UniProtKB/Swiss-Prot annotation:
Keyword set, alphabetical order: Heme, Hydrogen peroxide, Iron, Metal-binding, Oxidoreductase, Peroxidase
Enzyme Commission no: 1.11.1.21
Protein name per UniProt: Catalase-peroxidase 1
Necessary cofactors: heme b
Function in brief: Bifunctional enzyme with both catalase and broad-spectrum peroxidase activity.
PTM field: Formation of the three residue Trp-Tyr-Met cross-link is important for the catalase, but not the peroxidase activity of the enzyme.
Lineage: Bacteria, Pseudomonadati, Pseudomonadota, Betaproteobacteria, Burkholderiales
Active site: 92 (proton acceptor)
Family note: Belongs to the peroxidase family. Peroxidase/catalase subfamily.
EC category name: oxidoreductase
Protein's UniProt keywords contain Heme: yes
């Protein structure tokens, strides 16, 4: 080989055997550093909300309407209309959302990235997004991919004669894949029952998952594991849709409404289909699933392997889905690709062909469509919708809006002229500010009043944390605004220590009432604001106890929600099963406590340094649930010291597990053997894990006390304001 052809690098940065390969159980902190400015190409001062406000939404919609019926030779439109394809694209963008952790959903435009862009359930959606590129290119930064995908779904419905409930923009794009747990299977569409199965017992789906197989959005349309049993499929439908916050009525409306349009594609065997986008060659330029069956497109398209058109008007809103569902008896058959589907017995050919106007077909359905007839609860709803088309249309409009906006959080984030006026319970509504807000003098006076009540630093800090730390950056739910900590179900959560919480809230309500009653100009302080303000007072007092004067930032403007404005069932999913910041585990889990801490920190949008400083601070402030002494490595609780780190890193202490599960440890004096401290896995990980130990060493150093307090206050303030979208 000549010198010119020898490459000096056999491997490049990031290749080779990784730490994860060597130590697969190592705690992964990478999830805390996703979506930073380092991966974002936009200017530091770019504000997507402001950019969207300058968008001519009507012009974008006009262009989208034109696109719907402008069929492209490289990817022809079924029935001459892209509506069905774009409805599916929007549905699959939003439909990854799950209630358990709020992850997934349309926000961020994650359908552009792996693994979602290459899921088997998303075959051909690469083409849908590519059809949209000229419009995205035209409007540039003023509309994100995330917003455009959902807007296109809405316009598709409108262009086919359906009146939508509304549309809100405000979904800023992300620029790299989310790190989401989608399951443990190693094979796409792996069946249940294997070593990596997501099911246990009597088909009990693993939490937080909300799909039946790896690479699907919800259910297998052929039935559970491909078994064409509509009744069994109903179980899967109900479970997966419920995990996306949909009840039975919304589920029926979505399935029937979505399947009023378009068709599925199974013109030939799947063996003709090439690799998915992430595995395709460079020359494919991000497209995948290139097919060698016939022309590979149009009438020869292979997507799901099913070949079903539900209605006689697949580009027009109608009640045909229910008409066909109930008018015929159905017999099992197979698509040209060999997939299980159903055909109407003794039916005429009333279904148009997607590409040949001279052809007609008999009505066809999926196994999961028939579930809407043969499951008793679904059947009642389906018949009601069949007999009341206007009710069905309204139900679908509302369910579609919920599907496509569920992960956006409160209405404060909604942008654009088509935001519906109606406030919906699932949006966790909070009253608008209707009174003058407290000023700096009031803040100082209220802090003094709070500290004079006799409530401890621990009580003040714990209550404020419990109120604010319900926030999830995934779906923007939770947080201190609304003061829902005083309402069901939050007031009764074990992690919030209901009896102790009630005492603190009663005391703070007394301070609130006294202040509000004394005002003559209508000025008020909400309990939501006062809870956060009281926490700030506690932190300032704890810093003062450490000899450091610092002011915790505070911005009034929170309001108090009512019980009637709170969906108890929907709010229940925010209950922490673990909160390592308070050294809390609801029960024993397979997932280590330290991994649950990182997961919680990621939902709180914290970095590893922020997580570290908060744990160390909350321990010495006595914020543990049940006043547990685990991790309270200080002899001066209530003082915002760096003792947690200094004592954890002390080589004079030897740690040993004292529980069978290796989840509780004793730290003994190496010289005397006397027990000095006790701690959990969440505590000891900051001395064990090399990256976290490096951070702990920063805060455990002799010169770190002031920096520790300053960093704690900054991280604390961040958490207190995570849901303050009005401050952005």
């Amino acid at each position: 080989m000549s010198n010119e052809t020898k490459c000096p690098f056999n491997h490049t940065a990031g290749s080779g055997t990784t730490n994860k390969d060597w130590w697969p159980n190592q705690l992964n902190l990478n999830v805390l550093h996703r979506h930073s400015a380092l991966s974002d190409p936009m200017d530091p001062d770019f504000d997507y909300a402001e950019a969207f406000k300058k968008l001519d939404l009507a012009a974008v919609k006009q262009d989208l309407h034109a696109l719907m019926t402008t069929s492209q030779d490289w990817w022809p439109a079924d029935f001459g209309h892209y509506g069905g394809l774009f409805v599916r694209m929007a549905w699959h963008s939003a439909g990854t959302y799950r209630t358990a952790d709020g992850r997934g959903g349309a926000g961020g435009g994650q359908q552009r990235f792996a693994p979602l862009n290459s899921w088997p359930d998303n075959v051909s959606l690469d083409k849908a997004r590519r059809l949209l590129w000229p419009i995205k290119q035209k409007y540039g930064r003023n509309i994100s991919w995330a917003d455009l995908l959902i807007l296109t779904g809405n316009v598709a419905l409108e262009s086919m004669g359906f009146k939508t409930f509304g549309y809100a923009g405000g979904r800023a794009d992300t620029w790299e894949p989310d790190d989401v747990y989608w399951g443990s299977e190693k094979i796409w569409l792996e069946l249940s029952g294997g070593p990596n199965s997501r099911y246990t017992g009597k088909r009990e789906l693993e939490s937080p998952l909300a799909a039946v197989q790896m690479g699907l959005i919800y259910v297998n349309p052929e039935g559970p594991d491909g078994n064409p049993d509509p009744v069994a499929a109903a179980h899967d439908i109900r479970e997966t849709f419920a995990r996306m916050a949909m009840n039975d009525e919304e589920t029926v409306a979505l399935i029937a409404g979505g399947h009023t349009f378009g068709k599925t594609h199974g013109a030939g065997p799947a063996s003709n289909v090439g690799p998915e986008p992430e595995a395709a060659g460079l020359e494919e330029q991000g497209l995948g699933w290139k097919s060698t069956f016939g022309t590979g497109k149009g009438k020869d398209t292979i997507t799901s392997g099913l070949e079903v058109t539900w209605t006689s008007t697949p580009t027009k809103w109608s009640n045909d889905f229910f008409k066909h569902l109930f008018s015929y008896e159905w017999e099992l058959t197979k698509s040209p690709a060999g997939a299980h589907q159903w055909v109407a017995k003794d039916a005429g050919e009333v279904i148009p062909d997607a590409y040949d106007a001279s052809k007609k077909h008999r009505p066809t359905m999926l196994t999961t469509d028939l579930s809407l007839r043969f499951d008793p609860a679904y059947e009642k709803i389906s018949r009601r919708f069949y007999e009341n088309p206007a009710e069905f249309a309204d139900a679908f409009a509302r369910a579609w809006f919920k599907l496509t906006h569920r992960d956006m959080g409160p209405r404060a984030r909604y942008l654009g002229p088509e935001v519906p006026a109606e406030h919906l319970l699932w949006q966790d509504p909070i009253p608008a500010v209707d009174h003058p807000l407290i000023d700096a003098a009031d803040v100082a006076a209220l802090k003094a009043k709070v500290l004079a009540t006799g409530l401890s630093v621990s009580q003040l800090v714990s209550t404020a944390w419990a109120s604010a730390a319900t926030f999830r950056g995934s779906d923007k739910r939770g947080g201190a605004n609304g003061a829902r900590i005083r309402l069901a179900p939050q007031k009764d959560w074990e992690v919030n220590q209901p009896a102790a919480l009630a005492t603190v809230l009663e005391t703070l309500e007394g301070v609130q009432k006294a202040f509000n009653d004394a005002q003559t100009d209508g000025k008020k302080v909400s309990l939501a604001d006062l809870i956060v303000l009281a926490g700030a007072a506690g932190v300032e007092q704890a810093a003062k106890n450490a000899g450091i004067a610092i002011s915790v930032p505070f911005a009034p403007g929170r309001m108090d929600a009512s019980q009637e404005e709170t969906d108890v069932d929907a709010m229940a999913v925010l209950e922490p099963v673990a909160d390592g910041f308070r050294n809390y585990l609801k029960s024993a889990y397979k997932t280590p406590a330290e991994a649950l801490l990182v997961d919680k920190a990621q939902l709180l949008t914290l970095t590893a340094p922020e997580m570290t400083v908060l744990v160390g601070g909350l321990r010495v402030l006595g914020a543990n649930v049940g006043d547990s002494k685990h991790g309270v490595f200080t002899d001066r609780p209530g003082t915002l010291s760096n003792d947690f780190f200094a004592n954890l890193l002390d080589m004079g202490t030897e740690w040993k597990p004292v529980s069978a599960a290796n989840d509780v440890f004793e730290g003994r004096d190496r010289a005397t053997g006397a027990v000095k401290w006790t701690g959990t896995r969440v505590d000891l990980i900051f001395g064990s894990h090399s990256q976290l130990r490096a951070l702990a060493e920063v805060y455990g150093s002799a010169d770190a006390q002031e920096k520790f307090v300053r960093d704690f206050v900054a991280a604390w303030n961040k958490v207190m304001n995570l849901d303050r979208f009005d401050l952005a």
